[in-house]
Amino acid sequence: MRTRQKGFTLLEMVVVVAVIGILLGIAIPSYQNYVIRSNRTEGQALLSDAAARQERYYSQNPGVGYTKDVAKLGMSSANSPNNLYNLTIATPTSTTYTLTATPINSQTRDKTCGKLTLNQLGERGAAGKTGNNSTVNDCWR
């Protein structure tokens, strides 16, 4: 009578490797999308902070209007704390401004939302779209 050998067969190993490959093929892109979505909050925070500083500057400098200079807003850098977004201020008027957070470094992989915008009325935008559409709402949640 033959004794049964212990261990895994080559076929069993191939099946295990295939299952792991399939799981990784699903898990890694899902995780990367999660990281990109969670990093958007940094761009949103950058815009909200800059908007509050714009309003403070506007109220402390009557007759001057809004500024394009981030240094005048008391910001040490135009980049977000983790260097995921860069803040730009479109040429402001005495009564309007538009802030844009442009993704930089690893956040440039965000193809869904891309640039986030915020204006003096509190209107949010994303990927060149403004208003209350699903893309903007998804990007700002």
Curated annotation (Swiss-Prot):
SUPFAM superfamilies: Pili subunits (SSF54523). PROSITE patterns: PROKAR_NTER_METHYL. Coiled coil: none annotated. Disulfide bonds join C113-C139. It is a single-pass membrane protein. Its main location: membrane. It comes from the Bacteria. Keywords: Cell inner membrane, Cell membrane, Disulfide bond, Membrane, Transmembrane, Transmembrane helix. Methylated by prepilin peptidase PilD at the amino group of the N-terminal phenylalanine once the leader sequence is cleaved. The chain crosses the membrane at residues 8-28. Residues 1-7 form a propeptide. Disruption phenotype: Mutants show lack of surface piliation and twitching motility. Although piliation is abolished, PilA stability is not affected. GO terms for biological process: pilus assembly; type IV pilus assembly; type IV pilus-dependent motility. It is found in: Cell inner membrane. One of its GO terms (cellular component) is plasma membrane. Essential component of the type IV pilus (T4P) that plays a role in surface and host cell adhesion, colonization, biofilm maturation, virulence, and twitching, a form of surface-associated motility facilitated by cycles of extension, adhesion, and retraction of T4P fibers. May stabilize interactions between the major and a minor pilin subcomplex required for efficient pilus biogenesis. This is Type IV pilus non-core minor pilin PilE.
